[in-house]
Amino acid sequence: MAVKKIRPLTPGQRFRIAPDFSVLTKTKPEKSLLLPIKSTGGRNNTGKMTIRYKGGGHKKRMRIIDFKRRKYDIPAVVNSIQYDPMRTAYIALLYYVDGAKSYIIAPEGLKVGDRVLSGNNIAPEVGNAMPLRTMPTGTIVHNIELHPGRGAAMARSAGTYAQLLAKEERYVTLKLPSGEMRMVLGECMATVGTVSNSEHNNIVLGKAGRNRWLGRRPRVRGVAMNPVDHPMGGGEGKASGGHPRSRTGLYAKGKKTRNTNKYSKNYILSRKKR
């Protein structure tokens, strides 16, 4: 996937770097795999705002993604590569030989007409899904489960991947996209390859209106608020706000927020890079 620079015919196009959708298939989404999404505007069931700076945007429909890949030893053919408004990665529509259809996260390099497979004793080729214990050491993977059968939880966004470093008895060691080294059960499923749309981090929207199309409202700085609204608010003139804090008063630069008694701390061999 590549990006393209737009000619500066208008102020909104001057700095815009847009995604190049030439790798996508010009087709409509599969109706049987769509769900309607009701816009909440960041409000909960009582109408109170729980998420700020959210609302508006274009109407979307959710694609039902197969994060489990448990159709073992049933070949599937890639029918199309499509855009998904709910995520940064592209998705691939699979047609199984038994007549079933499903969407998966499209790995980099997967093309229309390619065959993919899930199972225990299959080749570690791009798009194939298998338990981590059956993969060779050094394999690049994405769409990784944390608990067997629950579906993928890690390395799902555009351009991300993890590397299988070692295998010991029931567990394997992975280097995650954050740089964290973590042990995961060997029975957990993962897909071979890197997630598609790796140039996503180079995209520049170019104007505020494009953020509004995505459902993002303007974010107010803490120092621009009143003291009643934010710890960094108030002051005479343009005050710095003092030491950076979150709206709830926590230090915003470097304070560890992870629960030190969390059960999974024993599976983390080294923390993510700063």
UniProtKB/Swiss-Prot annotation:
InterPro entries: NA-bd_OB-fold (IPR012340), Rib_uL2_dom2 (IPR014722), Ribosomal_uL2 (IPR002171), Ribosomal_uL2_bac/org-type (IPR005880), Ribosomal_uL2_C (IPR022669), Ribosomal_uL2_CS (IPR022671), Ribosomal_uL2_dom3 (IPR014726), Ribosomal_uL2_RNA-bd_dom (IPR022666)
GO function terms (MF aspect): rRNA binding; structural constituent of ribosome; transferase activity
GO BP annotations, alphabetical order: cytoplasmic translation
One Pfam family recorded for the sequence: Ribosomal_L2
Disordered: annotated segments: 223-274
Entries under SMART domains matching the protein: Ribosomal_L2, Ribosomal_L2_C
Keywords: Ribonucleoprotein, Ribosomal protein, RNA-binding, rRNA-binding
Signal peptide (UniProt feature, chain positions): none
Gene3D superfamilies found in the cross-reference section: 2.30.30.30, Nucleic acid-binding proteins, Ribosomal protein L2, domain 3
Organism domain of life: Bacteria
One Gene Ontology cellular component: large ribosomal subunit
Binding partners and assembly: Part of the 50S ribosomal subunit. Forms a bridge to the 30S subunit in the 70S ribosome.
Entry-linked PANTHER family: LARGE RIBOSOMAL SUBUNIT PROTEIN UL2M (PTHR13691:SF5), RIBOSOMAL PROTEIN L2 (PTHR13691)
Family statement: Belongs to the universal ribosomal protein uL2 family.
Role, per record: One of the primary rRNA binding proteins. Required for association of the 30S and 50S subunits to form the 70S ribosome, for tRNA binding and peptide bond formation. It has been suggested to have peptidyltransferase activity; this is somewhat controversial. Makes several contacts with the 16S rRNA in the 70S ribosome.
Protein name, UniProt field: Large ribosomal subunit protein uL2
